[in-house]
Amino acid sequence: MPLHKSAEKRLRQSARRNERNRARKKELKVLLKTVQKLVDTNADKKEVEAAYRSAIQKLDRLGVKRYIHPNKASRKKSQLSRMLNNYMKAE
């Protein structure tokens, strides 16, 4: 339990930021799983590309703003690109 007023404020700020960060990471996880599910179910190419684009945008945004490490964002983008390319070749 914080003993000082400033420590209480930092605790409140930290809790708010933690919640916000978790929500952003959850959104990213949902987008990545959506792309994976669409590829697995052989969905329409346009639908897969749209989901892919939104996932890439989210990865870029979170990497630049340091919600996730930029290298992790880059790695995930690369994995998604490979997945999409293999999917497009197969069809």
From Swiss-Prot:
Residues 1-21 have a biased composition (Basic and acidic residues). This is Small ribosomal subunit protein bS20. GO terms for biological process: translation. GO terms for cellular component: cytosol; small ribosomal subunit. Disulfide bonds: none annotated. The keyword Ribonucleoprotein applies. GO terms for molecular function: small ribosomal subunit rRNA binding; structural constituent of ribosome. It comes from the Bacteria. Keywords: Ribonucleoprotein, Ribosomal protein, RNA-binding, rRNA-binding. Residues 1-25, 70-91 are annotated as: Disordered. SUPFAM superfamilies: Ribosomal protein S20 (SSF46992). PANTHER family: 30S RIBOSOMAL PROTEIN S20, SMALL RIBOSOMAL SUBUNIT PROTEIN BS20C. The gene is rpsT. InterPro entries: Ribosomal_bS20 (IPR002583), Ribosomal_bS20_sf (IPR036510). Residues 70-79 have a biased composition (Basic residues).
